[in-house]
């Protein structure tokens, strides 16, 4: 029993060596991996998404290898090896439905993990977990292919310098800055502007950094994925005629758990290629990271593992770490991840969100209360946090301005009950001044988005970090106390506030 278990470990190690020597798989290499015919077997058992396949003694496939079943008319079902059961039998997880499979059907070993197309040919396309296009726009034009399972960059390859990734969004850059190569949790309910916020980030990264983005729908509703695709076409993020800025990777809610558990790795592999081979600063969106954990839990149960706390898989921390550790900055480029986080029953101690929080560098909270005020982006300036808001990283001036903005907003929040009961007249002169400045800051945190221009009619603004810090410093110092609140709403820099105030004054005469 020891030898069959040892063989796959050795072959997997050999594959990692080959992968290190030739990180980018081109088409001929990929063809050789599948046509060399490492081995073939026959289906022994089918139980839902789990398929047991029996091989010859010398041809047992390695753990994580992709197996294929020809279903006719060019359709292939992909299986991923999960366990070796003994008696030359492997237990696999199907990446698609297993309806119609029968015992005795022939199964081919590709000799490598699931391998997907990468590079610019994927931009503007929608692909599934196996890298196949699902947008009915023909095959993907790609010359490079990579396996979805890879080791994270070595310590020597990683860049350990904490750098701020400028997004051009004032509230984010000032109060909860994103780390280049960091991981950000995006919290928000339905209808608070999560999709528009994501689209603006994609647009700004393309403009400011020339970088690409990968949107990964893990356990997405098919309708939401379709809506996102249509909105991206309307706003120009996806350009069917020219080069698009984003690749969409979907493992929908109705798909088997195997596909949902692996689709995040597919999206990450595409992002890694842009980072490592093209030196890009890439944005990777994962919606929803909880569904990744949920799918892993389903797979674990199907494989017969004993569950741990709350029914989650015993390998929860390992699975999450394997994904998150690959999201990092290297000497060549970076992958910065924005992950929507669903919190089951609003219980932050649930193992799934609790494991996710351990990896996050920043949290961006979208608030319904702020969106009801008509302030967009509806980012909560007091709830959103970042480990990069540190004097050693952002500098003394930025840190002081951000702290004073938060203190002013917190003071206004604590005075709101008094104002609601007694009115503004009962406040001291200092408190009145604090409230006036806080209301101006609150409105100045709003910003017209380029992707929302078709709805608002206001041209989008991308504000540099330097201008953002200077503008808020001037408001805190009282330089613009004489200007009306309305002038601070939906503008870019402070110069626009002054110009808008003059325009409002002229119109009122």
UniProtKB/Swiss-Prot annotation:
What HAMAP family does the entry give?
ATP_synth_beta_bact (MF_01347)
Disulfide pairings: none
* Chief localisation class: mitochondrion
Please provide, in alphabetical order, the Gene Ontology terms of the cellular component aspect for this entry.
mitochondrial inner membrane; proton-transporting ATP synthase complex
Where's the transit peptide in this chain? Answer: 1-32
Q: Name one Pfam family in it.
A: ATP-synt_VA_C
The membrane-topology field of this record reads: Peripheral membrane protein
The site annotation (Required for activity) covers: 384
UniProt-recorded Gene Ontology molecular function terms: ADP binding; ATP binding; ATP hydrolysis activity; proton-transporting ATP synthase activity, rotational mechanism
The UniProt keywords, alphabetically, are:
ATP synthesis, ATP-binding, CF(1), Hydrogen ion transport, Ion transport, Membrane, Mitochondrion, Mitochondrion inner membrane, Nucleotide-binding, Transit peptide, Translocase, Transport
- Please state which protein family the record places this protein in: Belongs to the ATPase alpha/beta chains family.
Catalytically driven reaction(s): ATP + H2O + 4 H(+)(in) = ADP + phosphate + 5 H(+)(out)
For this protein, the Enzyme Commission number is 7.1.2.2
InterPro entries given for it?
Answer: AAA+_ATPase (IPR003593), ATP-synt_VA_C (IPR055190), ATP_synth_F1_bsu (IPR005722), ATPase_a/bsu_AS (IPR020003), ATPase_alpha/beta_chains (IPR050053), ATPase_F1/V1/A1_a/bsu_N (IPR004100), ATPase_F1/V1/A1_a/bsu_N_sf (IPR036121), ATPase_F1/V1/A1_a/bsu_nucl-bd (IPR000194)
Q: Where does ATP bind?
A: 189-196
Location of this chain's protein in the cell = Mitochondrion inner membrane
Q: Which GO terms describe its biological process?
A: proton motive force-driven mitochondrial ATP synthesis
The organism encoding this protein is Yarrowia lipolytica (strain CLIB 122 / E 150) (Yeast)
Report the protein name in the record. Answer: ATP synthase subunit beta, mitochondrial
Q: How does it assemble?
A: F-type ATP synthases have 2 components, the catalytic core F(1) and the membrane-embedded component F(0), linked together by a central stalk and a peripheral stalk. The central stalk, also called rotor shaft, is often seen as part of F(1). The peripheral stalk is seen as part of F(0). F(0) contains the membrane channel next to the rotor. F-type ATP synthases form dimers but each monomer functions independently in ATP generation.
Coiled coil spans = none
